[in-house]
Amino acid sequence: MLKKNCLPLVIGLLLGVAAPLAATAKDYLRTCWHQQGQSLQASCLTLNYRETVNELEHNAAPWQTTAYTGRGTVWTNAESFGKQDTLRAAARPRTYFSSTQWSPATLLFRDYGDQGLFAATPGLQQDYTFRAARYSPVALLAYFVQHRVPADKTALPGLVAYHATINETVVSLFIRRHDALLDHVTLLSPDELLGDVSTTFTYQNYAEAAGVRYPATIRIAKANGQVQDEVSIEAATSQPAAPMLLAPPPGYQLRPAAATQPEIRVERFRPHLHFIELEHTNDRVLVVEFDQFLVVAEAPLNSANGELILREARKIAPSKPIRYFVAGHHHPHYLGGLRPFVHQGATILYGAGSGPYVAYLAAAPHTLRPDSLQRDPKPWRGEEIRDTKTIADGTFTMQIFCIGAQSGHTNDYLVYYFPSEKLLFEDDLVGIPRQGPPGKASARQAGLYQAIKARGLAVDIVVQSWPVTEAGVKTIIPFVELEQSMK
C-alpha cells in the first residue's frame, strides 16, 4: 500500500508523462509527406500509367458518357509535375496527344488535338496543384506541408483530415491513422451548370519505388459521383530530373483571366416572335409573346445568362409573366440557364426522359457561386413532353413536338412549330452552308426533315438556335434548301 505522502509524487509523475505525450501528438501530415514525397528533393518520381476516362459530352441522354482509354508518363516531385500521354476514344479510331508541364509559378499545356500551347490563366495554373493528384498526390501534399495546414479535429473514424482552399476549390486530404498514408482527396469546385461539384481521388494498392510510397491504383469519382474513372500505375522509378516536355515561348506569361462581356442583340422577327442573340455564347434565344404571358425557349450554359435573358424578356413585354421555359434538349447550350426561370416561377418544359436530370439541375446547391435560386430557394415545376404540347391563347398557337431519337442527336429532342407563320424553330440539327448549294444531308438534318414530313407540318422557314454566326452555316433556312439536301 502506498503511503499518503507518496500520492502527490505518483500523480505528478502521471501528469508529467501525460503532458509531453499531448504536446508531441503525431503529425500525420508530415509523416505522410515523409513517406510519399520528402525524399524527392533532388529527384523526381516517374510513373508509367494507363487509365480509363469517361467524359460527359454532347451525348444522347443525360449522364451518358463517352469512354476513352489513355496511356502516359508522369514526372513529379514537390516543385514540378509533367505529363505526356495519349487518349483514344473507344468508339473512334483516333488517338489524341497532350503534354503538361507545371510548377508553382508556371503552366505549359498542349491540349488533346491542339498544335499550340493553351493560353493558361493564373487560376488554371493554381488548379493544377490538385488536378495533378489524379495521377500522384506528391505536389498536393507538398502544398499542404508548405502552408502548414492544420488537422481538422472532426475527422472521420480512422482518418485525419486537412482542408485548404486553392483558387475556388475546397481541397481536403484524408490520411489513414494506422499507417499515415493518404487515403483519399476530395475537391469541391464550382461548376456553372452542375453547381457545387465534388471529385474524389481514392488511393489504393500502395507500392514503393526508390523509398517513396505511391498508390498503384487511383479511383476517381467525379461529377458528384455520377462518373467514374480509374488510373493504374504500371511502373515506377526515380530519376534525377524530369525531361523538358514543352518550351515556353518568348515573353511567356500566364494570361490574366478576362471577364466575359455579354453582348446582346434583340430582334422582333415576327409580331409574336422575338429573338435574343447572345453573341458571347453564339446562341439565339426564342421569346414567344402571347396575349397574357411569354414563353422563353433556350438559355445557354449558366445562371448568369439566364438572368440576362430574363432581363431582356421583361423589356419586350414588361407586364407579361414568363409562364413557360422550354429547352430543346438537355445539352448545356439550351438548358444551362434554367435556374433563374425556376426562381421566377416558370413551368419548365422538357423532352421525354429528361425529368430527373432537370430536377437535379434545379435542386443542385450553388453555395460556391450563389445564384438567385441559391439565395432565395423556390420549388420547381416541370412538365414532360413525350409527344406534343400546344400552347395557345385564342389568337396565336405554338406547338411543341418531341421528335426524340429521330433527331439523330438526343433522345429528348423538342422542336417548336408555329402554324400561322409556317415556321419551325430547332436547336442545332441543320448544317447548310452560307455559301454554295446545300450538300448531302447529315443524319441530324435528315432526321429533322423526316420528322417534319411525318407530322404533316407546312414549313416555309427553319430557324436554328446555335450557332448563330460561327461554323459558316445558315441559321435562317428556307425549307426548300432542306428539301434539296435530301436529294
Segments predicted by a language model, with ranges:
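N-terminal mature ectodomain segment of secretory-pathway/periplasmic proteins
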Residues: 26-117
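Divalent-metal (often Zn2+) His-rich catalytic cores of metallo-beta-lactamase-fold enzymes
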Residues: 448-487
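Zn-dependent metallo-beta-lactamase
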Residues: 228-291
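Active-site metal-binding motif and surrounding structural segment of the metallo-beta-lactamase
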Residues: 304-349, 455-459
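Gly/Pro-enriched, hydrophobic low-complexity segments
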Residues: 156-247, 414-419, 426-427, 432, ...
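Flexible, processing/modification-adjacent segments and terminal tails
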Residues: 102-171, 177-179, 189-195, 248-255, ...
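Bacterial N-terminal signal peptides
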Residues: 8-18
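Conserved beta-strand hairpin/beta-sheet module of binuclear metal-dependent hydrolase folds
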Residues: 267-313, 413-432
